[in-house]
Amino acid sequence: MKKWKRILAVAVMLALVFCAGRGSAVLVKSWQNGGLLGVNAVASTTENWGLGFGESGTQPTGNATPEELRKYNTYFIGNGDDKVIYLTFDCGYENGNTEKILEALKKHDVKATFFVVGHFLETSPDLVRKMVEEGHTVGNHTYHHPDMSEIADVSSFQKEVEDVKLLYEEITDKEMVKYYRPPQGKYSESNLKMAKELGYYTFFWSLAYVDWYDTDQPT
């Protein structure tokens, strides 16, 4: 069983962020206490989230220092001493795979987090309800999936995440946790600051399974 979970994690993860089943408070605390890794300061202008990989068995590094990221409640990797894999999925459009993923997760008793955009909420409300019913967490990936680092005012930033929150709560009748993932991994210091001011925790990733090209989908 443990071996299969590791295989599932590598096969289907879009990023390493957190385990929904452990609870929001435990999650955030574990990230705050974890050994975040990085190499550069947070960019003041638009930056694409990037990773560096060292020797096999070591954690990757991000292109921002842990200290700078932590200032804005931003994380991408957990404590390397814990043998834990955090599964996340970015849901923009439904291509028939989400149901299969949910079935696999349920079969092997694995919890995950799904970052959703407005289009997914509008077109697949039943899948969103199923995510919640089966114990997964649903995070915020913005309504229109824009380059959020180009948004200069808090009100416009807030509308992108608030519209997702309102629709999610209308669909599920539950409060949405304030977990945010920047579309395309594009961010700036101002971007992360606005998210924090709105009460959000920002999560990047430490490994990505390249499945976002709609003309080159896995078969």
Q: Where are the model-predicted features located?
A:
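Soluble catalytic domains of enzymes that build or remodel membrane lipids, polysaccharides, and related
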Residues: Q158-L167, T172, K193-M194
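His/Asp/Glu-enriched short active-site or ligand-binding loop at hydrolase and phosphoryl-transfer sites
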Residues: L192-T219
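Active-site beta->alpha N-cap acidic-glycine motif
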Residues: G57-S149, K165-E169, M176-V177
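Short, hinge-like loop/turn segments at secondary-structure boundaries
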Residues: K130-E133, S156-K159, K196
